[in-house]
A protein has these predicted regions:
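Outer-membrane beta-barrel translocator/receptor signature
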Residues: 25-27, 39, 48-51, 62-144, ...
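Flexible glycine-/small-residue-rich
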Residues: 14-16, 32-34, 57, 77-79, ...
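Flexible loop and strand-edge segments within Gram-negative outer membrane beta-barrel domains
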Residues: 157-179
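Residue-level signature of outer-membrane beta-barrel architecture
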Residues: 32-34, 106, 148-150, 162
Length: 179
């Protein structure tokens, strides 16, 4: 990853896209639970529950379709299960960084269960803009996800999920140098 803000810059075998351009499709396909993420903006996810990440290098058009000339990145999130459990994780750091991530897994019945996650990530800016004192590079992100699994029969499982991310930031700190 190397993009600014929430735009991913993913390269596989030298093929990728650094900056967001609305008219250009990225050369590396990103898939979240099998769903294609069509643009690089918003492709940096603040996922709390990741089960697996697969990196498939080289052209993947046969399996994944267009926009995978460089390869594909497949992210699989954890599914709800039969166990009642939960956890909370907190990270503290410099520049007033506070990250809080939480998850709870609830079996509602023998064949219906849910998994809920919520994360709040915040950090103050690391560069002060000289003319107005605004901190640049600050980040305040909230993300959440609710996933449900219905085991209809021995042969049929139905998985449903919905998620959101809200990102409030002043943008990256960029300094122009006079030459």
């Amino acid at each position: 990853f190397g993009g600014a803000s929430s735009a991913a810059a993913i390269y596989i075998r030298g093929i990728g896209q650094k900056d967001f351009v609305p008219t250009v499709d990225p050369g590396v396909g990103i898939y979240l639970d099998g769903v294609y993420v069509a643009r690089s903006v918003g492709a940096i996810f603040d996922l709390v529950e990741i089960e697996q990440v697969e990196i498939l290098r080289g052209p993947q058009g046969t399996l994944f379709g267009r926009n995978t000339i460089g390869g594909a990145m497949s992210i699989t999130s954890k599914k709800p299960d039969e166990e009642l459990m939960g956890n909370v994780q907190m990270t503290l750091g410099s520049d007033s960084r506070v990250d809080i991530k939480s998850m709870v897994n609830v079996p509602f019945s023998e064949n219906f269960m849910g998994r809920f996650s919520l994360a709040q990530l915040s950090r103050d800016g690391y560069v002060e803009r000289s003319f107005d004192g605004l901190d640049l590079g600050n980040d305040d992100t909230m993300t959440g996800r609710a996933a449900f699994r219905w085991i209809a029969s021995d042969a049929v499982d139905v998985d449903m999920a919905i998620g959101f991310t809200e990102d409030d930031e002043n943008g990256p700190a960029i300094e122009l140098l006079g030459i």
